[in-house]
A protein has these predicted regions:
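Sec-dependent bacterial lipoprotein signal peptides
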Residues: 1-23
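Generic short beta-strand segments
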Residues: 55-61, 113-119, 154-157
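Short secondary-structure boundary motifs at beta->alpha junctions and helix caps
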Residues: 65-81, 144-195
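Surface-exposed short loop/turn segments
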Residues: 24-32, 97-149, 159-164
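A structural "domain/chain start" motif
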Residues: 21-84, 187-205
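Mid-chain, structured segments of secreted extracytoplasmic proteins
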Residues: 76-100
Length: 205
């Protein structure tokens, strides 16, 4: 009986270890670090200073990870939800440009979507290349009429080499790609133009 119990205990331990190994992941603490101060195009326009940002829609093909599995089977995942990272980055840029983020009653509404937030790993002869790619789609909606006045898409790529600290290289590649995508948004003159084209709310009787 004792031998049978020991065998059963050993078997359950092996199964548990296999389960842990199958769920192993490499967690990256990805954040947003603006590369430069916002350029004039995104400066707040007088007609629309209050902005509502809708929850970011995740359109990624695989929303469970941000990079491929490594040789040891660890998939790259983000410590924070990707939609939260993108929303916070967008809010940070708009706030720096002089806009006020509000939960409701805004002059304009932004409807963001994240299409890609991914790290590719390219193993070379002497070094490993980490390629971060971020794609964000953004719709500007007139709060008064509910009409979409602008739809834009921002694509950014960043490359980093890293063998001594692959985790940091992967994180840096993705953070720089995110910063570039937001920089493109911040310097896009069509955004404040769309904000300024909003309709006046209907007068109350």
């Amino acid at each position: 009986m004792r031998t049978g119990r020991i065998a059963a205990l050993m078997l359950s331990t092996v199964v548990a270890l296999l389960g842990i190994g199958g769920c192993a992941s490499s967690v990256l603490d990805v954040g947003y670090h603006p590369a430069t101060a916002p350029n004039p195009p995104l400066r707040a326009v007088a007609q629309a200073r209050r902005v509502v940002i809708r929850p970011v829609v995740d359109r990624r093909l695989d929303d469970t990870r941000i990079g491929p599995a490594s040789k040891n089977g660890e998939a790259m995942v983000s410590r924070r939800p990707v939609v939260d990272i993108v929303r916070d980055a967008l809010a940070a840029e708009l706030t720096r440009a002089g806009y006020s983020m509000v939960a409701e009653g805004g002059d304009v509404v932004l409807a963001p979507e994240v299409e890609e937030f991914w790290i590719d790993v390219v193993s070379g002869y002497k070094t490993t290349l980490y390629v971060g790619r971020v794609v964000i789609a953004l719709a500007v909606v007139d709060a008064a009429s509910g009409e979409r006045v602008l739809v834009r898409r921002y694509v950014a790529i960043s490359r980093r080499e890293g063998d001594e600290n692959p985790k940091r290289a992967a994180r840096d590649a993705l953070e720089v790609a995110l910063a570039r995508a937001l920089h493109d948004l911040a310097t896009d003159p069509t955004i404040p133009a769309a904000f300024g084209s909003r309709s006046d709310p209907p007068a109350r009787s």
